Amino acid sequence: MAQRLPVLYNKKPCYDIVFQQSFDGLWEELAELGAADKRLCIVTDSTVDGLYAAQILKFLEGKCRKAVKYVFPAGEEHKNLDTVRDVYRFLIEEGFDRKDMLLALGGGVCGDLTGFVAATYLRGIDFVQIPTTLLAQADSSIGGKTGVDFDSYKNMVGAFKMPRLVYMNLSVLKTLEERQFYSGFAEVMKSALIKDAPFYEWLIENMYEICERDLNTLEEMVIRTCSIKKIVVEKDPTEQGDRALLNLGHTIGHAIEKYKNFELYHGECVALGTVAAAYISWKKEMLSMEEFYEIRDMFVPFYLPISVDDIDPQEILKLTKSDKKMEAGTIKFILLKKIGKAVIDRTVTDEEILAAIEEINFSEEDAHE
């Protein structure tokens, strides 16, 4: 039987996160949303298309008014307004109206882009998240943040749009490419660090089972991660306060991601950004030295970087200034008071940021000397 997490919006039921180990229950969930009387469009990328789109289209055949798919080229570089325009055009040509529905089948890029289309097409159309990466299941598919990149600004154009459903087939994690899998773990780790010290300890205790991708262990891990995010976004759905805590590692992480022209995965950059944030927390005497090194080294068994070559600290600093989390010219930095407790800090100086960037700006061999 599927496990479910109901998510509230303004203290009222909004949507369910459904955890399954196959796609077999998807139509039943869609039918509950009135999908039989709707046109459905699967929006997916060129990588995920060949893996799951045909299977899901087969489930939909003959059960709804119309089932089509739109495939865009895979990669962060295609998460932009040009792709959004192409999806708009496709939906218009296929006759989609405000009563129809989009299905975001893929990772974080697909969910962000599809959600933004759903928020803006005809002033709003329903959409469902079907995340197929650990990063999307653990983080980006939940909470209603949607958006695309604009020039050098990541997620600069966006909207809050809650999905009608988040359907997670956890079995896809078994076959996920290794680097993609571990990239997603950075968001799992982030969730534990900001809100749940016992979960952090659980991750350490279950390290082997996670790396072996034991399905029951992965299910518990994803459910616990989603539970943390659910609590945070229910209290602060539009990021006016504590929802910003979910941005641990993202200020410097986004800057590195852009500087490296998206050669590094998002989760890899979040890991680097989290190490940098933990370093600043140590230097501000929030964390002990031992806690900093423990956090840093926790990423290593999960094949996540704790240092990066060939970055210009001044350029990274400059890119942090274009971060959308700036407020009145000040960066809202997320720091750690201890493992399991994060805080918003507006006092981080350029010198502290540069020192943190220097800390991660060397070879991994040097990091263990």
Regions found by a protein language model. Give the residues of each.
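Solvent-exposed alpha-helices and their adjacent loops that cap or buttress functional pockets
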Residues: 10, 34, 95-97, 120-121, ...
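Non-catalytic interfacial helical region
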Residues: 88-105, 114-129
